[in-house]
Amino acid sequence: MSMKIEVYTKLYCAYCQRAKELLRIKGMDFIEYDITDDQLKAAEMQLRSQRQTVPGVFINDTLIGGCRELFDLDEQGELDVLLGQLTLPAESK
């Protein structure tokens, strides 16, 4: 299955830089939408996420959240699973 990762960012946003760096470390390609001067893309992000803050991270059209949520998922080991880099162990029967 092809993974689609989209990240809405602003030019001088440190949180955006951190989120993108984490995705790069994970070896993931992503589509970046710089909404610094793009009102149309900013409105699109707000409509999709129901929030106005960046970054806005979407994986397969599902809102993951921002930088904090992305790092929280990583710390819990759930980001690798979500990105398809790790599978959950099968439950014992």
Annotate each PLM feature.
Residues I59-P89:
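Non-catalytic, surface beta->alpha helical segment in thiol-disulfide oxidoreductase systems
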Residues L47-T53:
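Thiol/disulfide oxidoreductase modules built on the thioredoxin-like
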Residues M1-D29:
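Local sequence-structure signature of Cys/Sec-based thiol-disulfide redox active-site neighborhoods
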Residues A14, L40, G65:
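Short alpha-helical
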Residues D29-K41:
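Thiol-based oxidoreductase modules, predominantly thioredoxin-like and allied folds used
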Residues S92-K93:
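Charge-patterned, long linear interaction tracts outside catalytic cores
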